[in-house]
Amino acid sequence: MSETLATDATTPAEKKDFIRQIVREDLASGKHTVIRTRFPPEPNGYLHIGHAKAICLDFGLAAEFGGLCNLRLDDTNPAKEDPEFAAAIQDDVRWLGYDWAQLRHASDYFEVYYLAAQKLIRDGHAFVCDLSAEQVRQYRGTLTEPGRHSPFRERSVEENLDLFQRMRAGEFPDGARTLRAKIDMASGNINLRDPALYRIKHVEHQNTGNAWPIYPMYDFAHSLGDAVEGITHSLCTLEFEDHRPLYDWCVDKVDLVGHPELLQPLLDKGLPREAAKPRQIEFSRLNINYTVMSKRKLTALVEEQLVDGWDDPRMYTLQGLRRRGYTPAAMRLFVERVGISKQNSLIDFSVLEGCLREDLDAAAARRMAVIDPLKLVLTNLPEGHTETLQFSNHPKDESFGTREVPFARVLWIEREDFAEVPPKGWKRLVPGGEIRLRGAGIARVDEVIKNADGDIVALRGWLDPESRPGMEGANRKVKGTIHWVSAAHAVEAEIRLYDRLFSVEKPDDESEGKTYRDYLNPESKRNVRGYVEPSAALAAPEQAFQFERTGYFVADSRDHSASTPVFNRSVTLRDAWAK
């Protein structure tokens, strides 16, 4: 992809968070003339809502300041990575409304990393260690006790270079040796206690095949990847704050800016020379109640078939949220409202739902659908009576136009809109009572039909002929208005009523001996058969509607068709979880 300026999907008012203030100061002082950021996910799973915050920040920041943002796939652990995940990541970024200046892979820089590691060895900053993983843990020490030097720490430069070259040649089995940095085994920051820079893994790589039996560790590859790409502001969440000293150590000791010869493999590949010294800046991660965002736990939900795959609309993956009906605009609005800070906090899920309601209230056309149908026969209309009514597609926006809705003698209405024995304050249908049928006139119930078990199966009533649209009687006051669909014309649809996957605010809380599995909400998905007006059935996959008086729904991206409509409830009209 050609190097183009990042384009933000929104043009918000100037934001005042601490990261943007740093960027403004860096530009004003002349420290940087062009801002460069990157979004560097590992392609070992699907992105979740927490990644949306990072995406919007990385790409949005570059766009706001006329800079560039790369998408870099951190493919340094091939045993857990898959091209399927890499493709999904790219799809998710574009879905959110962003595009990258360049698509890069950490594997593009494997030769640079190798040369950098050799430089560290020559400079006396790295050594090949023969300790096993368990022995390394024993030597590392604790938070209160310093670590001990590896017995292999004082190998000569020549021996280290030879062993590292033989590691590269594939002479040794997995786990036999590592390349470690020489930093400080007494440091209070355990990340600085001679961390591993390379490990042996005889695993085929998706991009490089079997060319490399050794792979760089995350901290080494991540910091140098930023330096290689000339990233000015490397943004990450607070859990990496303790890694920043190691990040800076790698950048400073390798010094790609001062040693351009290390970048020759990039030039050989036709990649530009852009090296610079990056600055890591940490911000709070996104934590939302009623969710889990651990990749391990999300994977378990899928593998244990507790959900219907990574794009299950109850999942907090971007693929799942998209299938649920969440929009890019709602996601960006949510990130903007959450804001950027250094203080971890728990965001209420209702904030996310509110952003979706706000977006769809403006963006979604209206349709009528009946979720739990009850038949209403208007006996004063002739058998076979059918007419066409004109309905506005959006009560607040004339640009949405109008549509034709068939009206007939037999209708489906919501079962919950009738009460044989109404509670106090009831404003819908009752025996002998009147109600306004949305856009059609005023109806009265005269007879309740029951089956042998005493269940209500139908209502028989009367439509006031003087209350039809355009007539003076149409303005007659009645207690309420209900929606309906014509029984003869409506299309039967599968309607999936989704709700929050977990029933408690903190499903990660295991203080009572329970796990997140114990808090799964049994009502998180209900499949019902209902009826939608004909124009709704013709929706394209992922087309959103407000089903009047019911909620916001989206045509399912996988299963929906005009002949077999499937709609997912994205969000209710009001917060059903409000306390």
Curated annotation (Swiss-Prot):
GO cellular component, one term: cytosol
Xref: PROSITE patterns: AA_TRNA_LIGASE_I
Residues that bind ATP: 42-44, 48-54, 237, 285-286, 293-295
Position of sequence motif 'HIGH' region: 41-51
Motif ('KMSKS' region): 292-296
Major enzyme class: ligase
Reaction(s) catalysed (UniProt annotation): tRNA(Gln) + L-glutamine + ATP = L-glutaminyl-tRNA(Gln) + AMP + diphosphate
One annotated GO molecular function: glutamine-tRNA ligase activity
GO terms classed as biological process: glutaminyl-tRNA aminoacylation; glutamyl-tRNA aminoacylation
EC number: 6.1.1.18
Binding site for L-glutamine: D74, Y218
Keywords: Aminoacyl-tRNA synthetase, ATP-binding, Cytoplasm, Ligase, Nucleotide-binding, Protein biosynthesis
Cellular location(s): Cytoplasm
InterPro entries: aa-tRNA-synth_I_CS, Gln-tRNA-synth, Gln/Glu-tRNA_Ligase, Gln_tRNA_ligase_bac, Glu/Gln-tRNA-synth, Glu/Gln-tRNA-synth_Ib_cat-dom, Glu/Gln-tRNA-synth_Ib_codon-bd, Glu_tRNA_lig_a-bdl
Family: Belongs to the class-I aminoacyl-tRNA synthetase family.
Subunit field text: Monomer.
Protein name: Glutamine--tRNA ligase
Gene that this polypeptide is encoded by: glnS
